[in-house]
């Protein structure tokens, strides 16, 4: 089966959706989703979106981002992120986003390692709210076609020019050819036994990139979130207890009810302290306590967390939440420039799939959705400016072994992560004996 478009977008999270809305409406766009269109990590982002509160906040925001990233960030990317943050928040509001407000305007909350309150948010479901708003807008665009339940297994290229991609659609091969291809398939959390990510997020684009000699960067930079709800279900998605809970004053306690860390330190430091405390006390988890806060405040500020914990038998207004670290975010990915362009012509990568270098070795809280917005818009605007000069190339291809390539992509990525991070190899899932057959 074969289809054609001006632009092919692989992925339907915030990065992919926002890119499509910033592309010209006279362009034919196909967006492909691995499962249902709204099953993505973007919908799991709870805390909010960081934004510079005016030019006077630029340097502080830049410094907070650099400090969290161990000063291994790309400084040019950080400047772009910060200086273009408010423009993109305003565009989201124009599209229908409804961030929390009081009589003086938009409210800003604080999260770990931010010097000031600069996070806009929608209750404790900011990512889902933004995803829903963007998807509503996309569905109104007649030039955007969505294909669900369709997994990418390879890209097509002529020399160093990307011309399309190959997909597994219901066990059949689907070839989509386009002038420009955008990869926005998210991170690698589905490769870990304990992750806050959706299980389908398995680094598909990154495995494909490695196999096709596209430049990648910082694959060893994997973020562990300090506070995922502790469950004895060993290989299921872990429910995130947002950074904003600590930002509002939540306290981390050991099994003896003692505080042991400054809750607003960067994520990697808090996670390390929790691991040390768990080892010291021979415990599987620590506790995040908000029981001293008003019940009405908790229900209003964190309705999703409040109700989810109740489902697990925990009333957070009366007892602390059992938490433990879990894989959360991937700072590495496909190396891109300031417009999301990869080392292959006419191929872009946005969001967690990409590596802009903006996060350095450790992402600052609430910079993930912001990165997806800022750089996908920049890339879309660049595509708008030159796509009319590109030729659509269609090549006849023989039917591929879809399962072989799917498993090989995963094996290549897992092997590379294990090579770089032998310390976490036991935390990774395997793709079973089938991987050996595909190598």
From Swiss-Prot:
Transmembrane annotation, as ranges: none
InterPro entries (alphabetical): FAD-dep_OxRdtase_2_FAD-bd (IPR003953), FAD/NAD-bd_sf (IPR036188), NadB (IPR005288), Succ_DH/fumarate_Rdtase_cat_sf (IPR027477)
GO MF term list: L-aspartate oxidase activity; nucleotide binding; steroid dehydrogenase activity, acting on the CH-CH group of donors
GO biological process: 'de novo' NAD biosynthetic process from L-aspartate
Cofactor or coenzyme needed: FAD
Keywords: Cytoplasm, FAD, Flavoprotein, Nucleotide-binding, Oxidoreductase, Pyridine nucleotide biosynthesis
EC number assigned by the record: 1.4.3.16
Catalytic activity: L-aspartate + O2 = iminosuccinate + H2O2
Cofactor note: Binds 1 FAD per subunit.
Residues binding FAD, per UniProt: 12-15, 34, 41-48, 204, 352, 368-369
Major localization listed first in the record, in broad terms: cytoplasm
Pathway assigned to this chain's UniProt record: Cofactor biosynthesis; NAD(+) biosynthesis; iminoaspartate from L-aspartate (oxidase route): step 1/1
Protein family according to the UniProt entry: Belongs to the FAD-dependent oxidoreductase 2 family. NadB subfamily.
Name recorded for this polypeptide: L-aspartate oxidase
Organism: Clostridium perfringens (strain 13 / Type A)
Lineage start: Bacteria, Bacillati, Bacillota, Clostridia, Eubacteriales
Gene: nadB
């Amino acid at each position: 089966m074969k289809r054609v478009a001006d632009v092919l977008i692989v992925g339907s999270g915030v990065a992919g959706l926002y890119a499509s809305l910033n592309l010209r409406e006279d362009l034919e766009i196909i967006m492909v989703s691995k499962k249902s269109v709204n099953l993505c990590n973007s919908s799991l982002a709870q805390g909010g979106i960081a934004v510079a509160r005016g030019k006077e906040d630029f340097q502080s925001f830049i410094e907070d981002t650099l400090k969290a990233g161990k000063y291994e960030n790309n400084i040019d990317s950080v400047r772009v992120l910060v200086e273009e943050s408010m423009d993109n928040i305003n565009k989201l509001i124009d599209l229908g986003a409804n961030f929390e407000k009081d009589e003086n305007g938009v409210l800003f909350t604080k999260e770990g390692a931010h010097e000031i309150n600069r996070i806009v948010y929608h209750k404790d479901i900011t990512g889902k709210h933004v995803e829903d708003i963007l998807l509503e807008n996309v569905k109104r665009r007649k030039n955007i076609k969505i294909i669900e339940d369709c997994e990418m297994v390879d890209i097509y290229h002529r020399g160093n020019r990307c011309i399309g991609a190959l997909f597994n659609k219901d066990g059949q091969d689907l070839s989509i050819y386009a002038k420009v291809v955008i990869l926005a398939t998210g991170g690698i959390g589905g490769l870990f036994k304990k992750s806050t990510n959706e299980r389908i997020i398995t680094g598909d684009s990154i495995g494909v990139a490695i196999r096709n000699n596209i430049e990648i960067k910082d694959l060893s930079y994997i973020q562990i979130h300090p506070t995922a709800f502790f469950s004895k279900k060993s290989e299921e998605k872990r429910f995130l207890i947002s950074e904003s809970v600590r930002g509002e004053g939540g306290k981390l306690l050991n099994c003896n009810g003692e505080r042991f860390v400054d809750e607003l330190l960067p994520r990697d430091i808090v996670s390390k302290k929790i691991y040390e405390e768990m080892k010291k006390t021979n415990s599987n988890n620590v506790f995040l306590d908000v029981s001293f806060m008003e019940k009405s405040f908790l229900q209003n500020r964190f309705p999703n967390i409040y109700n989810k914990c109740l489902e697990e038998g925990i009333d957070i207004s009366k007892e602390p939440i059992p938490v433990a670290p879990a894989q959360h975010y991937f700072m590495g990915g496909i190396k891109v420039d300031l417009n999301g362009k990869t080392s292959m012509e006419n191929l872009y990568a946005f969001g967690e799939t990409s590596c802009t270098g903006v996060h350095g070795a450790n992402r600052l809280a609430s910079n993930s959705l912001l990165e997806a917005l800022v750089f996908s818009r920049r890339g879309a605007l660049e595509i708008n400016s030159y796509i009319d000069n590109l030729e659509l190339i269609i090549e006849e291809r023989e039917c591929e072994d879809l399962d072989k390539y799917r498993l090989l992509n995963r094996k290549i990525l897992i092997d590379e992560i294990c090579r770089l991070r032998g310390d976490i190899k036991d935390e990774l899932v395997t793709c079973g004996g089938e991987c050996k057959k595909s190598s």
